[in-house]
Regions:
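Non-catalytic, conserved peripheral segments adjacent to functional cores
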Residues: 1-99
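Well-ordered alpha/beta subsegment
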Residues: 95-109
C-alpha cells in the first residue's frame, strides 16, 4: 500500500469489567499502538467530533494532513474518493469498529 491509498483497519473490541463484581461495564477499543504500525503518517493533531443522527458532514479536502476516523457510538458511513476517482463507502460502528485513513488530497464526507 502506498501513502496515498485510502485504508481501513479492523479494530479489536474488548469488554471491560467492574473490579468488584466483574459485571461488564463497557468496552475498550485500542485505536493505535505503536507496535501495530496501523497509522502510516505520524499524527500531529487529535480531536473528537460528533454527528447528530441523520445528519452529514463534508465533503471536504485536507491538503496538508492525513485524517483518521473511527466511530465509537452508533454507526457512520464514511465516503471517500480514491486515486481512480471512485467513491468508497466505508462503515464503522461501535459493534464493528474500523479505523479509516484518508490521505491528504482525498475528498471525504
Amino acid at each position: 500500500m502506498t501513502e496515498s491509498e485510502i485504508k481501513t483497519t479492523k479494530l479489536e473490541k474488548h469488554q471491560t469489567k467492574d473490579i468488584l463484581d466483574k459485571h461488564v461495564n463497557g468496552f475498550m477499543i485500542p485505536v493505535w499502538r505503536d507496535w501495530d504500525k496501523t497509522i502510516s503518517v505520524k499524527p500531529e493533531m487529535v480531536y473528537m467530533t460528533s454527528v447528530n443522527p441523520g445528519e452529514r458532514k463534508g465533503p471536504h479536502l485536507h491538503k496538508i494532513r492525513h485524517s483518521y476516523y473511527v466511530c465509537i457510538k452508533g454507526k457512520v458511513v464514511f465516503i471517500a474518493k480514491d486515486d481512480s476517482g471512485n467513491y468508497l463507502e466505508i462503515e464503522s460502528s461501535e459493534d464493528n469498529p474500523v479505523l479509516v485513513e484518508i490521505p491528504k488530497n482525498h475528498s471525504s464526507a
